[in-house]
């Protein structure tokens, strides 16, 4: 079974195209299953934006409810554990759970709006959740012809 690359979609059509493109490039180069999270950002979008890639011939499936639950559980656990670590200084116990419960799973957030080469060299042995806008064509330039066909 291949590792999964889950890409969080957010914003309008232009942003979604960039997010899909980085996901497609990483999944293509690392033989990963591409999954699009078209749900978590659009629940309470103040601009009423929606998933807009359904008119394209994309090569990805949409995220399931179970996958969303796992991602949110991990995200919330990490937020709470950071607060506990800072306030109480308890980190050995929490690190044990992080390593044993989530070692197969990695959430990557965009650090800045500029190109980050490290993102293209991510581990293909883990399921990965990408969260960011990824607005540089450098992320997907190598598969430009594939994207144009889609």
Predicted regions, residues:
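Residue-level recognition of conserved structural "scaffold" positions that shape functional pockets
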Residues: 18-21, 142
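Secretory-pathway luminal glycosyltransferase catalytic domains
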Residues: 48-150
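Lumenal/extracellular "mature" regions of secretory-pathway glycan-modifying transferases
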Residues: 1-13, 17-18, 25-87
């Amino acid at each position: 079974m291949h590792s999964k690359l889950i890409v969080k979609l957010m914003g309008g059509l232009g942003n979604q195209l960039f997010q899909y493109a980085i996901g497609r490039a990483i999944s293509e180069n690392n033989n990963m299953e591409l999954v699009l999270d078209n749900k978590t950002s659009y629940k309470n979008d103040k601009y009423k934006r929606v998933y807009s890639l359904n008119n394209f011939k994309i090569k990805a499936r949409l995220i399931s409810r179970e996958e969303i639950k796992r991602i949110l559980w991990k995200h919330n656990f990490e937020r709470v554990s950071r607060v506990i670590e800072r306030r109480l200084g308890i980190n050995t116990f929490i690190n044990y759970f992080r390593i044993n419960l989530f070692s197969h799973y990695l959430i990557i957030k965009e650090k800045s709006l500029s190109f980050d080469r490290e993102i293209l060299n991510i581990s293909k042995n883990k399921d990965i959740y990408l969260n960011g806008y990824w607005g540089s064509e450098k992320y997907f330039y190598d598969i430009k012809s594939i994207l144009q066909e889609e």
